[in-house]
UniProtKB/Swiss-Prot annotation:
Belongs to the universal ribosomal protein uL14 family. It comes from Solibacter usitatus (strain Ellin6076). It comes from the Bacteria. The gene is rplN. The lineage of its organism: Bacteria, Pseudomonadati, Acidobacteriota, Terriglobia, Bryobacterales. One of its GO terms (cellular component) is cytosolic large ribosomal subunit. This is Large ribosomal subunit protein uL14. Binds to 23S rRNA. Forms part of two intersubunit bridges in the 70S ribosome. PANTHER family: 50S/60S RIBOSOMAL PROTEIN L14/L23, LARGE RIBOSOMAL SUBUNIT PROTEIN UL14M. InterPro entries: Ribosomal_uL14 (IPR000218), Ribosomal_uL14_bac-type (IPR005745), Ribosomal_uL14_sf (IPR036853). One of its GO terms (biological process) is translation. The keyword Secreted does not apply. Keywords: Ribonucleoprotein, Ribosomal protein, RNA-binding, rRNA-binding. One of its GO terms (molecular function) is structural constituent of ribosome. It holds the Pfam family Ribosomal_L14.
């Protein structure tokens, strides 16, 4: 699960490199977030020529998580890293590319644009 101060990698080409979660919204009374949950995060590292600068507060959706997640069919899914994709106020991705696989749970949570940009859906 993604909690407060968790470091997230950015899985898109928006210009941010690393994020720190400052407000998870999801299960456990809003204290932790899982796959497909929207969180508020602060940019810790950014590319030098990007529009998104270090210190900016952004919204993002969790696309990969190290902690295993149980699916309804009884299987478990786990990734090698904690990663997120930056989204705007409407819920569409800020970047135009998504790097690495994303979880199938994003399709259930109506993030179809992110799913279509991803090279692989697991």
């Amino acid at each position: 699960m993604i909690g407060m101060r968790t470091i997230l990698e950015v899985a898109d080409n928006s210009g941010a490199r690393r994020l720190s979660c400052i407000l998870p919204r999801g299960g456990d009374l809003g204290l932790r977030a899982g796959l497909g949950d929207v969180v508020t995060a602060a940019v810790k590292e950014a590319a030098p020529d990007s529009a998104i600068k270090k210190g900016k507060v952004v919204r993002c959706v969790i696309v990969r998580m190290r902690k295993e997640t149980r699916r309804k069919d009884g299987t478990y899914i786990r990734f090698d890293s904690n990663a997120a994709v930056l989204i705007n106020d409407v819920g569409e991705p800020v970047g135009t590319r998504v790097f690495g696989p994303v979880a199938r749970e994003l399709r259930d949570k109506k993030f179809m644009k992110i799913v279509s940009l991803a090279p692989e859906v697991i």
